[in-house]
Every structure is written in structure tokens, then in C-alpha cells.
Amino acid sequence: MIKNTIKKLIEHSIYTTFKLLSKLPNKNLIYFESFHGKQYSDNPKALYEYLTEHSDAQLIWGVKKGYEHIFQQHNVPYVTKFSMKWFLAMPRAKAWMINTRTPDWLYKSPRTTYLQTWHGTPLKKIGLDISNVKMLGTNTQNYQDGFKKESQRWDYLVSPNPYSTSIFQNAFHVSRDKILETGYPRNDKLSHKRNDTEYINGIKTRLNIPLDKKVIMYAPTWRDDEAIREGSYQFNVNFDIEALRQALDDDYVILLRMHYLVVTRIDEHDDFVKDVSDYEDISDLYLISDALVTDYSSVMFDFGVLKRPQIFYAYDLDKYGDELRGFYMDYKKELPGPIVENQTALIDALKQIDETANEYIEARTVFYQKFCSLEDGQASQRICQTIFK
């Protein structure tokens, strides 16, 4: 009771401080934040890099305490969240470019343009479309009310395709005129670098991946009912890594990429398995991967830009589809690759990856046309020209 009261008082004081400081606007300042200040990544990063080349504005990142080293390594200007410099930056900024929800106790001035980039094409139900929220620390009503409050503050919401646009309007309670249907800025790199052998080999070299090996990335999503604490989830790899190693020859390297909400990390197995969950730019990992193994993650849509083979390891399909989230699309009919539901089927699909690639050429093309047709490498430009016209 006392703890909750103190929390509310702190939130109210932050709201009041933001409101006061917003009366001293900095019309040349743009504020960026990715995954709650833990990463230099995703759509905000792509927009930041575009603006460094095409704008004279002052660009600043908001960073969670403990993650400053990431931005120091890249020589990127930042302020630590809840520091004095942060209080003097975020509420006064001309624009916010953020890819996740922000607390409603962060006051946003009408003079600040809030661009919500979001972070994926939705396969699983999101926002107000989740009829039974099973996330730790909230319930269905509070979760949905929070989304409504948040989306009312957005001036623009980025959509990667028409499919997402139609979903976002209801799931986020946002009007069509606020949605910028442009493609995703983070996918500009995929269009620009997909055939750049020197760039791709450079990434492999940094990760100590032999240039002659096939790279398979496993990138599953998180499960709502596997929370360790509020906002943090565990994930158990549902296959035997040693069995996979024995079944595949020495020509393969497996990359494990966990969702940003998953705190579980996997032990690496010699040079066969590499945990790349902390590698900041997943676009680089797409570029070096010959194939993707996922489940219900939106990575399938980004990887679809490259039209490379995908395998869908959906070992808990019925539970996930019926009990946890539910899907917007027909999961069993619209995917650009085979669904496998156990370890044996997964290994067989990986061993026959070339045959699978040929079998699903048409499916990948149809998938690309529906979800990736806007990804022409110019999304960042389109967004910035609209916001700062």
C-alpha cells in the first residue's frame, strides 16, 4: 500500500516536471528511444541514421541506466533516463521517435510530435484485440485502457504494409489519418545491403562465422504465460542441440536470437551454436542467414524481404493460437514455408532446406507481395519528409 502510494507520487511529480519543462521547447531537438532505452536498434536507429545525413537537428537518445556503454561504443549522443539531462531533453523535444509504449505519466506537449514506429508486422493478436490478457502485472481491462491512453498521444504511427494498417486501427485505437503506411525504416538496410557480399562477409567475420558455412537463425517469440517477473520472460529451446549437431554436418552454424523481452540466455556449443540475442542490429543477422527458423514472431515479415527459406517450428501451435494470443492471418495457409511441430520434423526440414526452398518459391513471392512490397529502401525518407515537411 505505502509502496504503491510512493510510486504514484513519484509518477505525478515526473508528469508535473515534464509539463513545466515542455513550456521551454527546443525546436531543434529530436529524441529517440528503442525498446525502453535498452538498445541502439530498430526503426528509431534507422531514422536516426537517416537524419544524421539529411538534417541539422540536434539528435539525442534516451538510455536506461546500465546500458550507456552501447551508445558510447557507437559515439552516439545520449542522456540517461531520469537524469537531469534527460529531464531537460525529452519533454522539450520537437519530436519523439520511439518503438514501444511509454508510460502515461510522461507528459507530452502538443508542441512535440510523437512518432510511434512500433516494432513489427502483427501475426499474433496485439493491443485491444487480445481478449484475455495473461501477462504478469496487469489484467485485460487495465492493459486495454493503457493502450487507449497511449495511442491518444501518438501523432503518427508507422505501418509496414496495408495488412498492418487495417489491424492497427482497431488494435491500437488509432485513426487512419495518423498512420504512415511507408514500410519499416529498419528494413531499408535489407534493400540496400542484400547483395553486398563485402558487407555480409564483414558481419560473419566479426561473429567468427566461417564464410563457407550455411547460417540458420532460430528466432522465436516469447510466451505470455512464461513470465519470470513483469516485463521479463524465460524461454526454453524445445529441441536437443546435440541431436541437431549430429544430424547436420559441419557445414552449418546455428544462430539463436531471443526476443527482447526474454532474459534467458543459451549456452553456446563450440562453433555450432551462437547466441546472438545481444547483437544490436537484427538486420545484419538476417543478411548473413541463409534460412530462418521461427514460430509466431514478426521476424518472418522482415526476413520475407529477402525471399529466403523459412521454417516454422510451432511445437505449441494449438495452445498459442487458441489460449495465449490467437492469429490475424491463417497461420496454416499463408506462411512462406513448412510448419514443423516436433524435433524430428525440424531436423528433417533443415536437412532438406534446398528442396524446401524450391518447393515454397511461389509461397514466398505471394508472402512478399502482401507484406513486404513497400520495403524499397526509402521508408526513412518518406517518414521524415512527411513529419518535417
Swiss-Prot record:
Family: Belongs to the CDP-glycerol glycerophosphotransferase family.
UniProt protein name: Teichoic acid glycerol-phosphate transferase
NCBIfam families, per the entry: techglyph_taseTarF (NF041712)
Main function: Catalyzes the addition of a second glycerol phosphate unit from CDP-glycerol to the prenolpyrophosphate-linked disaccharide, to complete the linkage unit.
InterPro entries per the UniProt record, alphabetical: Glycerophosphate_synth, TagF_C, TagF_N, TarF, Teichoic_Acid_Biosynth
EC number: 2.7.8.45
The UniProt record lists the keyword Cell membrane: yes
Key words, A-Z: Cell membrane, Cell wall biogenesis/degradation, Membrane, Teichoic acid biosynthesis, Transferase
